[in-house]
Amino acid sequence: MCGIAGFYHPQNIFQGNEKYYHKILQQMMNSLYHRGPDQQETALFDNCGMAHTRLSIVDLENGRQPMSRSIEGHRFHIVYNGEIYNLPYLRKNLQKKNLTPDTSSDTETLLLSFLAFGHSFIKEVDGIFSFAVYDEFHNTLSLFRDPFGVKPLFYGEKDGTVIFGSEPKACFCYPGFDPELDLSGLNEIFSLGPAHTPESGVFRGLHQVPPGCYVVFSPMGSRIHPY
C-alpha cells in the first residue's frame, strides 16, 4: 500500500511560490504517512505538484517517486499506488517502441507505457492500481483507477485547482478545500450502504475516479473516460 496526492492548475505556475506549495505537498504527504512508511517524497513542477508515500515491494532502490521520464525532450511525471500482474507483457510491448525500462520498477513500466502509447495503454494493464500522470508538454493531468476500484483515488476542485489523493484527508490539506458534509450523499450511504451512485459521496465537491475509468484535466476542462 502506498499513498499519492497532489494538485494541478493549467494556468497557475506553482514554482513561482515554491516554498508555499511545497509546504502544502508536505502536509498532504504527512497525512498519508501510514500508507507508506518506507519513503516519502514530493516534487513541484510548473502546473502540478505531486507527493508520494511508499511501501516498498518492487525494486526497493530504483522505484522512487514521484518518478520522471522524458521522450523527445518532453517530460512526464507519475505517482502510483498498486500492484501490476502482467509486467512482462507490458515490457514486451515497450520493445515495439524501442523502449527499455532502466529498472524493474512497475512504476517506470507504467510511465513508459503512457509515453509510448498514450492513454489507450491502460486497457492492457492487469492489476489493482490508482495513479496520476502529469504531461508537461500537453499540460494535462490524468488520474487512473483499476477496473474494480480496489485502490482508492479521490479528487476535487478549488478555484480551478484540481486536488487529488488516496484519501480524503490528503485533499483537505489544500487551503480552502474544506470538508463539508453532503447530506444527499450521506443519505445514500446510510440507505444503500456501502454502495452509492457515481459522483456521490460523504463530502461535497469530493469525488472518486470511477472504477475502470481515467479522468483527464487540461486547459480545455476535464473529461471522464471509461476503458
Please describe what each predicted stretch is.
Residues M1-Y227:
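Cysteine-centered catalytic environments shared across enzyme families
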